[in-house]
């Protein structure tokens, strides 16, 4: 009897143990199945964008691109659609050789040239004589500076021919007429120093400066009014000199220097009152600072000069030859750093900016030099 009871208990224990083992296996299988389902559920969230992770039902229940769409059913705030704004057009750089150049230009000074006509011919030129090409981005910003007094007739011809030419050259430029006030002796180089400073006050972006006499008009638009690695002399073949360079060191008429080149030579001399000498002094400054003159081909650098009598109060400077010999010393103290003047008026005209200045008066001839 006891053996029978013992055998029965043994079978019962084995059965209970088997059931416990079976229960454990089922629990383990269910655990891993639930874990796999949770893992798959959360992996779907991790692959969505942050907006979808925060609002998983927004993309399917709300059409935010429609003005009358609503998110009330989902309980989410309405979000306006993010429409791409207009992109600014990419303006390419201006070509080295502008495509609209015509080459040789016929220049004549016989027909009347009213300023109103010149203004009608140049509708793209802004107030103050500023212009920038609409279809390309120039590499330089050019200030054209004209020393001036009592030459309104010449200025109208200059504006008539130069504005169309500069626009064909795809320049970003401004024209500044530096008008010497009063009837004291004329001082061309000092007016050019004033023009350099006043142009930079208006626009610090100027990095190229063209210094032009008002009575000189280029005969070829391939004579590009730009600055290069060396100072540039543009007017190398004037009709006045038989379309030849008068002498090797001549730097008169029309010239161009970058801002860095101009500052390197301390600008132009201020003490050349009257006609002559300042161009040769400028040439000496360029040579003494280790730079060389760059010039266009003689067939391109041709100019016509408007014939006129010599201006009153612009007599030849009797001290000019002595001064030229002393450039090495005088350029250290006489130049852009020592120029003194007073601006009387700044007037922005349709085709140019007129700056009237008082530049003082010369010392007596006995104390000059």
Curated annotation (Swiss-Prot):
GO terms for biological process: brain development; carbohydrate metabolic process; cerebellar Purkinje cell layer development; locomotory behavior; memory; protein glycosylation; visual learning. Mn(2+) binds at residues 215, 308. One of its GO terms (molecular function) is N-acetyllactosamine synthase activity. Keywords: Disulfide bond, Glycoprotein, Glycosyltransferase, Golgi apparatus, Manganese, Membrane, Metal-binding, Signal-anchor, Transferase, Transmembrane, Transmembrane helix. Its cofactor is Mn(2+). It is found in: Golgi apparatus, Golgi stack membrane. It is a single-pass type II membrane protein. The keyword Protein transport does not apply. CDD domains: b4GalT (cd00899). The chain crosses the membrane at residues 16-36. Residues 58-73 have a biased composition (Polar residues). Its EC number is 2.4.1.-, 2.4.1.38, 2.4.1.22, 2.4.1.90. This is Beta-1,4-galactosyltransferase 2. The lineage of its organism: Eukaryota, Metazoa, Chordata, Craniata, Vertebrata. The gene is B4galt2.
């Amino acid at each position: 009897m006891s053996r029978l009871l013992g055998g029965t208990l043994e079978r019962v224990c084995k059965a209970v143990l088997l059931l416990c083992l079976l229960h454990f296996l089922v629990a383990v299988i269910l655990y891993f199945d639930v874990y796999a389902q949770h893992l798959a559920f959360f992996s779907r969230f991790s692959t969505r964008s942050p907006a979808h992770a925060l609002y998983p039902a927004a993309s399917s229940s709300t059409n935010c691109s429609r003005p009358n769409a609503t998110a009330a059913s989902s309980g989410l705030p309405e979000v306006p659609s993010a429409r791409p704004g207009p992109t600014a057009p990419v303006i390419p750089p201006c070509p080295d050789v502008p495509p609209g150049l015509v080459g040789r230009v016929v220049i004549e000074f016989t027909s009347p040239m009213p300023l109103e006509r010149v203004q009608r011919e140049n509708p793209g030129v802004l107030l103050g004589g500023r212009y920038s090409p609409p279809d390309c981005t120039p590499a330089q910003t050019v200030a054209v500076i004209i020393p001036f007094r009592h030459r309104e007739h010449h200025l109208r011809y200059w504006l008539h021919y130069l504005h169309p030419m500069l626009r064909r050259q795809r320049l970003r430029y401004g024209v500044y007429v530096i008008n010497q006030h009063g009837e004291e002796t004329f001082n061309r180089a000092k007016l050019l120093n004033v023009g350099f400073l006043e142009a930079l006050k208006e626009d610090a972006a100027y990095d190229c400066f063209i210094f032009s006499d008002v009575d000189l008009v280029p005969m070829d638009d391939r004579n590009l009014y730009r600055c290069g690695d060396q100072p540039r002399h543009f007017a190398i073949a004037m009709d006045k000199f038989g379309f030849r360079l008068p002498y090797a060191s001549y730097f008169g008429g029309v010239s161009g220097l970058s801002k860095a080149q101009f500052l390197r030579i301390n600008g132009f001399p201020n003490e050349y009152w009257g006609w002559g000498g300042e161009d040769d002094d400028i040439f000496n400054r360029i040579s003494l600072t280790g730079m060389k003159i760059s010039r266009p081909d003689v067939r391109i650098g041709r100019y016509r000069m408007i014939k006129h009598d010599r201006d009153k109060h612009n007599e030849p400077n009797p001290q000019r030859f002595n001064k030229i010999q002393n450039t090495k010393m005088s350029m250290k103290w006489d130049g852009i750093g020592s120029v003194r003047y007073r601006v009387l008026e700044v007037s922005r005209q349709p085709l140019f900016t007129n700056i009237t200045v008082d530049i003082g008066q010369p010392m007596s001839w006995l104390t000059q030099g």
